[in-house]
Regions:
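Hydrophobic alpha-helical segments within soluble ligand-binding/sensing domains
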Residues: 109-135, 151, 155, 186-195, ...
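Alpha-helical recognition/docking segments in bacterial nutrient-uptake
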Residues: 8-122, 126, 198-201
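Short beta-strand elements in bilobed, periplasmic/extracellular small-molecule ligand-binding domains
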Residues: 37-48, 154-186
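Short acidic capping loops at alpha-helix termini that bridge into adjacent secondary structure
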Residues: 131, 163-166, 228-233
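N-terminal helix-turn-helix DNA-binding module of bacterial transcription factors
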Residues: 1-10, 306
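Flexible loop/turn connectors
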Residues: 194-306
Length: 306
């Protein structure tokens, strides 16, 4: 009885662990989580790791004393902490919005990044683009979801016999070790595109790993007096709010980010309910995996090459 009363007195809150809050993608995920949590009468604590391993470890250790009713990771946990996350998941409901190819024994709302990369490549190939560039943040082992997206893109071009026609421009690893500024990813797109244009003007299309990078690409091209899509086509990924604005009208990939946030929260709610309604004193064990089919959104920044 005492234990039951203690459980009843626990504050109804969830913890969201996010790698940054500067990219609208994570803000959209958070919006989806928060809207569903609010409907269910839950509050949220947000832990921003800033892709710092020490910060991530510190937050994970804090969970034992905070004792939230659930934890949502808005990206894959760092590899060195996957064991800690699985241990937490055996005591507290945990859901991860992750890259489908990662091996993690917890509930997940999955994203097949390789498929996203293939979709981006297929769109450009169908338009007739043959010489293209891909602009990305650091492609490190810690950030496998980025590499998977690039790999999918290269695979599609490879199957068309054009893999050697793709230029990969990735930021240096130090970028992930610095605290992200509000314009960090935009700057990656802007600076790497300027570098690219100094090296070659042969490319007919430039892809940003995400929309924020693509915005930087657009500004660098505008500064170089190159027309989009007349001279160079540009493509992003995530279908963030800014991509939809009339002046930008960015071709991108929609993978239903807000819905994923809501689904991650729903998974936690189901786990909390099943924990509270034990069947013959045996807690049911279930694993949830949700995946959305991504959709190409063609707008005004991609067209046939000259």
């Amino acid at each position: 009885k005492r234990r039951a009363r203690k459980e009843e007195r626990r504050e109804k809150f969830l913890v969201v662990i996010s790698p940054n809050l500067t990219n609208p993608y994570y803000v959209m995920l958070l919006q989806g989580i928060e809207s569903r949590a609010k409907e269910q009468g839950f509050g949220l604590f947000v832990c921003n790791t800033q892709r710092d391993l020490k910060m991530e470890e510190r937050y994970l250790k804090m969970m034992w004393s905070l004792r939230p009713l659930g934890i949502i990771y808005t990206c894959n946990p760092s590899h060195c902490f996957m064991g800690m996350v699985e241990e937490l998941a055996s005591h507290i409901p945990v859901a991860v919005v992750n890259n489908q190819n990662e091996k993690l024994n917890v509930d997940a709302v999955e994203l097949d990044n390789s498929k996203l990369g293939r979709m981006m490549a297929r769109h450009l190939l169908e338009l007739g683009h043959r010489k293209v560039a891909y602009v990305a943040p650091p492609l490190t082992t810690r950030q496998k979801q980025r590499s998977k997206r690039v790999e999918g893109f290269l695979k599609e071009f490879g199957e068309a016999g054009l893999k050697d026609q793709v230029i990969i421009k990735a930021a240096k690893e130090e970028m992930d070790q610095n605290i992200a500024h509000i314009d960090s990813e935009y700057k990656i797109g802007y600076e790497l595109t300027k570098e690219l244009l100094a090296e070659t003007r042969d490319v007919t299309a430039i892809v940003g790993l995400n929309d924020m990078i693509a915005f930087g690409v657009l500004d660098a091209l505008h500064e170089a007096k190159l027309k989009v899509p007349g001279d160079v086509s540009v493509m992003g990924c995530d279908n963030t709010l800014f991509a939809r604005m009339h002046k930008v009208s960015l071709t991108t990939i929609e993978h239903f980010v807000i819905f994923k946030g809501r689904d991650a929260c729903d998974i936690i709610m189901k786990k909390i309910t099943s924990h509270n309604e034990k069947y013959s004193e045996i807690e049911p064990i279930s694993t949830y995996h949700v995946e959305y089919e991504p959709k190409l959104i063609v707008r005004g920044t991609t067209s046939y090459p000259k």
